[in-house]
Amino acid sequence: ASRGLGDVYKRQVTKYIQPKLFVFTNIFRDQMDRYGEIYTTYRLIMEGAAAAPEATILCNGDSPIFNSKETVNPRKYYGFNHLPPKEQLAHYNTDGVLCPKCNHILHYKMITYANLGDYYCPNCGFKRPELDVQLTEMVRMDNTSADFVIDGEEYGIAVGGMYNVYNALAATAVAEYYQVAPDKIRAGLAYDEKVFGRQETIKVGDKECTLVLVKNPVGLNQVIDMMGLAPYSFSLVSLLNANYADGID
């Protein structure tokens, strides 16, 4: 069985059950009102994982924070290797681009978005770890779907956005860890059931509306990029509230 847990609840859950596998996808500015900075969130997550030391951590290798500290748990990494190397820096307003070893600004050979990509530190040699599961080609992507190649197999999803391709890559990495056949992985990724606010489509009169929930600045940028892939014109409505965290907003 698989379960999605809030960032700080791993410490509570591992008191009662011993997971076999943790999956770490990313840490962005989702819930600063509850947990503080991204490094505080990461510390809380790792405390929970350490309580189940035999469980493997399957990490997004493109995220520098997941390679910043040693762990008692064995680790495996997934990530993108779909573009030729090109020296670059992340946007100046990007979080998490200081080397966790020496505080020098990280450089990149490839960036997918935000601070995710093939990073390295020119000062101390800190760099992205070797990837165990790799996305090697983006075949096609628009605002409603994407096709891509992971470890030599082509897969597709019926939702748009690079962030959803990352989710599919994480799911594929889990499936490969448990030796699930590619055909079954393909069928699972192709399953199309929209949930509330996650590119959910509803009818309003004779118009079709797509709802997209945004919870942090990186997510907002990604949704804007995704909308820019639409091959048609559309109207955009943005709804904003100033309530507290999940469950009230």
Region locations from a protein language model:
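Glycine/threonine-rich flexible loop motifs
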Residues: 32-40, 247-248
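Gly/charged, well-structured mid-domain segments that form the phosphate/adenylate-handling core
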Residues: 140-143, 175-214
